[in-house]
């Protein structure tokens, strides 16, 4: 798993500046999360933690099972006024990067030129976000047990 890396970014430049959500997993177990929103003067939220090899294997399994590596973003909608999404994956000797506009719902996916490929991307992102949010929530809410 020495060449494993996954990074997701979703963001835009709007009236509140550069707002984005980004997270990544590294082969050494480092997992990072950043969320920047200037709405109501919110500030940048950054979280870092180390996850076990088992968690990394689960992330890799999720990516493998999605078969996203077989897809191409050539026919996907490009970045627009609502922003963009990026997914970068390095695993099994392959390095691939996808970029498309922000997708609000499955209707956006179905109305695209490549609904099947974009559906793979859409559901993979949902799975990766759910895992990331769960890990962040658990890691920063748990308190060590005192003897």
From Swiss-Prot:
Record gene name: mnh1
Taxonomic superkingdom: Eukaryota
Protein name as catalogued: Protein mago nashi homolog
One GO cellular component term: cytosol
The species this protein was found in: Schizosaccharomyces pombe (strain 972 / ATCC 24843)
Compartment list: Cytoplasm; Nucleus
UniProt cross-references to PANTHER family, sorted A to Z: MAGO HOMOLOG, EXON JUNCTION COMPLEX SUBUNIT-RELATED (PTHR12638:SF0), PROTEIN MAGO NASHI HOMOLOG (PTHR12638)
Disulfide partners: none
UniProt similarity note: Belongs to the mago nashi family.
GO biological process, one term: nuclear mRNA surveillance of spliceosomal pre-mRNA splicing
Lineage of producing organism: Eukaryota, Fungi, Dikarya, Ascomycota, Taphrinomycotina
Matches recorded under InterPro entries: Mago_nashi, Mago_nashi_sf
Keywords: Cytoplasm, Nucleus
């Amino acid at each position: 798993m020495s060449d494993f890396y996954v990074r997701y970014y979703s963001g835009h430049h709007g009236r509140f500046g550069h707002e984005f959500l980004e997270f990544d997993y590294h082969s050494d177990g480092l997992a990072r999360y950043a969320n920047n929103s200037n709405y109501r003067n919110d500030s940048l939220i950054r979280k870092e933690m180390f996850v076990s090899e088992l968690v990394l294997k689960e992330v890799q399994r999720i990516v493998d099972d999605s078969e996203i590596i077989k897809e191409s973003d050539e026919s996907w909608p490009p970045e627009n006024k609502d922003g963009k999404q990026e997914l970068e994956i390095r695993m099994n000797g392959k390095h691939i990067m996808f970029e498309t506009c922000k997708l609000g719902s499955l209707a956006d996916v179905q109305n695209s030129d490549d609904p099947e490929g974009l559906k793979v991307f859409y559901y993979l992102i949902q799975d990766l976000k759910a895992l990331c949010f769960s890990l962040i929530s658990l890691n920063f809410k748990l308190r060590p047990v005192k003897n």
